[in-house]
């Protein structure tokens, strides 16, 4: 018989640096999950990723307090900021432009995000990433 799922926990944790401090500790502790076991497993799974990149993770907690987790790709905003070489997006994206990205960079980001995105083909995913870039105040160049 399959184990009963008691909770799904969604977090964003920096790759390779999960520790029991907030937000990880309290989120897992209230569901009775072994926090250190998760931290060790998460850090081992994300050691190949760029250290410090925010990594979304979905943790499935079962009735016997065991867990499984699935890591996702970093957020598009993080990848766009890295590609444009900026610290943060524009507060007024319609008026103030803070950087530029090329279509080639957008295609690279879309390929990275492909497992987590919905869309008919790569071109549709590139358009989605381009929309995120424009909403951050980035100019998309050909």
From Swiss-Prot:
Alphabetical list of SMART domains matching this protein? RL11
Q: Which GO terms describe its biological process?
A: translation
- What are the record keywords, sorted? Methylation, Ribonucleoprotein, Ribosomal protein, RNA-binding, rRNA-binding
Q: Describe PTMs of this protein.
A: One or more lysine residues are methylated.
Function noted in UniProt? Forms part of the ribosomal stalk which helps the ribosome interact with GTP-bound translation factors.
Listed under subunit, the entry gives: Part of the ribosomal stalk of the 50S ribosomal subunit. Interacts with L10 and the large rRNA to form the base of the stalk. L10 forms an elongated spine to which L12 dimers bind in a sequential fashion forming a multimeric L10(L12)X complex.
Q: What is this protein called?
A: Large ribosomal subunit protein uL11
Q: Which organism is it from?
A: Aeromonas hydrophila subsp. hydrophila (strain ATCC 7966 / DSM 30187 / BCRC 13018 / CCUG 14551 / JCM 1027 / KCTC 2358 / NCIMB 9240 / NCTC 8049)
Q: Which gene encodes it?
A: rplK
